[in-house]
């Protein structure tokens, strides 16, 4: 059986890796990356809340244990 000649492998692999690296760099160069969003100042709206001026009960009487 003849031996496999591997002397030209580094000669072929090195330019292939260099070419792949250059292609990926060129593709990334043409890619548009968006800037992170900047926060916008928000205006707080005052809604009419009828429960604010009133006192409300926190617990219902039915949820309390029976008292003797």
Swiss-Prot record:
Q: How does it sit in the membrane?
A: Single-pass membrane protein
- Residues with the N6-acetyllysine modification: 54, 57
Sites where N6-succinyllysine occurs are at 54
Recorded GO MF terms? proton transmembrane transporter activity
Lineage: superkingdom: Eukaryota
Q: What is the effect of changing residue 55 to R?
A: In MC5DM2 and CMHI
Write down the Pfam families for this protein, in alphabetical order.
ATP-synt_8
Transmembrane spans? 8-21
Kindly state which keywords UniProt assigns to this record, in alphabetical order.
Answer: Acetylation, ATP synthesis, Cardiomyopathy, CF(0), Disease variant, Hydrogen ion transport, Ion transport, Membrane, Mitochondrion, Primary mitochondrial disease, Transmembrane, Transmembrane helix, Transport
Places the protein is found: Mitochondrion membrane
KW RNA-binding (keyword) present: no
Q: Name its GO BP terms in alphabetical order.
A: proton motive force-driven ATP synthesis; proton motive force-driven mitochondrial ATP synthesis
Cellular component terms, GO, for this chain's entry? mitochondrial inner membrane; mitochondrion; proton-transporting ATP synthase complex
Membrane keyword on record:
yes
Family assignment from sequence similarity: Belongs to the ATPase protein 8 family.
What is known about its subunit structure?
Answer: Component of the ATP synthase complex composed at least of ATP5F1A/subunit alpha, ATP5F1B/subunit beta, ATP5MC1/subunit c (homooctomer), MT-ATP6/subunit a, MT-ATP8/subunit 8, ATP5ME/subunit e, ATP5MF/subunit f, ATP5MG/subunit g, ATP5MK/subunit k, ATP5MJ/subunit j, ATP5F1C/subunit gamma, ATP5F1D/subunit delta, ATP5F1E/subunit epsilon, ATP5PF/subunit F6, ATP5PB/subunit b, ATP5PD/subunit d, ATP5PO/subunit OSCP.
- Role, per record: Subunit 8, of the mitochondrial membrane ATP synthase complex (F(1)F(0) ATP synthase or Complex V) that produces ATP from ADP in the presence of a proton gradient across the membrane which is generated by electron transport complexes of the respiratory chain. ATP synthase complex consist of a soluble F(1) head domain - the catalytic core - and a membrane F(1) domain - the membrane proton channel. These two domains are linked by a central stalk rotating inside the F(1) region and a stationary peripheral stalk.
**Disease tied to this entry:** Mitochondrial complex V deficiency, mitochondrial 2: A mitochondrial disorder with heterogeneous clinical manifestations including neuropathy, ataxia, hypertrophic cardiomyopathy. Hypertrophic cardiomyopathy can present with negligible to extreme hypertrophy, minimal to extensive fibrosis and myocyte disarray, absent to severe left ventricular outflow tract obstruction, and distinct septal contours/morphologies with extremely varying clinical course. Cardiomyopathy, infantile hypertrophic: An infantile form of hypertrophic cardiomyopathy, a heart disorder characterized by ventricular hypertrophy, which is usually asymmetric and often involves the interventricular septum. The symptoms include dyspnea, syncope, collapse, palpitations, and chest pain. They can be readily provoked by exercise. The disorder has inter- and intrafamilial variability ranging from benign to malignant forms with high risk of cardiac failure and sudden cardiac death.
Protein's UniProt name: ATP synthase F(0) complex subunit 8
Source organism (scientific name): Homo sapiens
